[in-house]
């Protein structure tokens, strides 16, 4: 009976600690890109509105809102594309490492 209990306990425990490091790495990546998703579009919106469109190009306030919003939307898409690229490469790397064992 003890042998069955030990086998059941071993089945419940993870066989290696790569899952924990993988989870931590994934969480760090997610938090990093979350911070980028918040700061980059907002920062680019106000920077391009004030300094580029109104300052350098001399656009009106109404036009600069429009073009700065377009820059912010493009920035969101760039951050999302980078996140997908990093997540794809990280997942395939972990899959290859697990496959070699």
Swiss-Prot record:
Where is the chain membrane-spanning? 26-46, 66-86
Residues assigned to the Lumenal compartment are 47-65
The name of this protein is Vacuolar ATPase assembly integral membrane protein VMA21
- Tell me the membrane topology, using the record's own terms: Multi-pass membrane protein
Q: Which InterPro entries match?
A: Vma21
* Family of the protein in this entry: Belongs to the VMA21 family.
Provide one Gene Ontology biological process annotation: vacuolar proton-transporting V-type ATPase complex assembly
The record's subcellular locations are: Endoplasmic reticulum membrane; Endoplasmic reticulum-Golgi intermediate compartment membrane; Cytoplasmic vesicle, COPII-coated vesicle membrane
- Provide the function of this protein: Required for the assembly of the V0 complex of the vacuolar ATPase (V-ATPase) in the endoplasmic reticulum.
């Amino acid at each position: 009976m003890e042998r069955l209990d030990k086998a059941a306990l071993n089945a419940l425990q993870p066989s290696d600690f790569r899952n924990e490091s993988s989870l931590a790495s994934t969480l760090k990546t997610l938090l990093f890109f979350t911070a980028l998703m918040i700061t980059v579009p907002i920062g680019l919106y106000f920077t391009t509105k004030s300094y580029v469109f109104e300052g350098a190009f001399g656009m009106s306030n109404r036009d600069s809102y429009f073009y700065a919003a377009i820059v912010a939307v493009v920035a969101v898409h760039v951050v999302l594309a980078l996140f997908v690229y990093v997540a794809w490469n990280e997942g395939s790397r972990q899959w290859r490492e697990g496959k070699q064992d």
